[in-house]
Amino acid sequence: MSEKKFRSGFVSIVGRPNVGKSTLLNRILGEKLMITSDKPQTTRNRIKGIHNVPGGQIVFIDTPGIHRAKSRLNKFMVDEALSSVQGVDLILFLVDGAVDPEKEAGMIKEVLSGVDAPVILVMNKIDLVPKGELLERMSCYGDTYPFKEIIPVSAGTGDGVEQLVQLVHGLLPEGPCYFPDDILTDVPERFIVAEIVREKIFRLTHDEVPYSTAVVVDSFKERENGVVAISATINVERDSQKGIIIGKRGDMLKRIGTQSRQEIERLLDTKVFLELFVRVSGEWSDNSRMLKEFGYE
């Protein structure tokens, strides 16, 4: 009896903003690694999430949502997403199942033009699709592009996610174990900490404020008593945004700090001392030097 081959590879997750890419990956990993919010364009960088299955390893790549870029930051985000479909073994193209497929057809054809890797269309949020319309919508997507498979899932409830993972694993080539099996991601803890703080800003503030913030971890040190001391700066573009982030009598900054600290403590499994500062950094989202300084290269 022949030994089962080990399958592994890189799988890019792409789609419009707010279709549930990060939520899906968190569900697959069984851990909250990717930040999420109900606002579009929460994800800014490509982040790898490593999922080990019996007989294989899947390296998922979470990407920013594909949208019309205005600032240099937006262009960076879109470039991150579009470049991720090259050189991978498989692509998961995520769509909101509740959206009319005809509205997505043009974007799908444009993004996947010239792509060599097989593509699975993942229809997310199927719990929001009216009864009786699911098969019709799947058929419409099938006329748009020669997808390898069309899979309906709900990242929120978990419906269909395990079947998706099994399908992905089966389509990957034979290959090595790229990462140790106890590694969840290839990004450092400092990056994840900055993302957690940014997520709280997205969840607690509104309008242009979350889109105008960049979080930089200035120091990350473990003290002799085991407490991790973290200092981070929240960069904004205008004085008015700084005032909103700080809030009346510092209340908003306190809420951001408390919620961030609690999640960072769960992540690091230790006590955390978190110090947050707010700085006005001008129009940083359109400044090449600052974008590089803040990690958007």
Curated annotation (Swiss-Prot):
NCBIfam families: era, PRK00089.1, small_GTP
Organism this protein belongs to: Geobacter sp. (strain M21)
Localization per record: Cytoplasm; Cell inner membrane
Subunit and interaction comment: Monomer.
Gene encoding the protein: era
Sequence segments annotated as region (G1): 15-22
Location of region: G2: 41-45
InterPro entries tied to this protein: G_ERA_dom (IPR030388), GTP-bd (IPR006073), GTPase_Era-like (IPR005662), KH_dom-like_a/b (IPR015946), KH_dom_type_2 (IPR004044), KH_sf_prok-type (IPR009019), P-loop_NTPase (IPR027417), Small_GTP-bd (IPR005225)
Pfam families (alphabetical): KH_2 (PF07650), MMR_HSR1 (PF01926)
Name the record gives this protein: GTPase Era
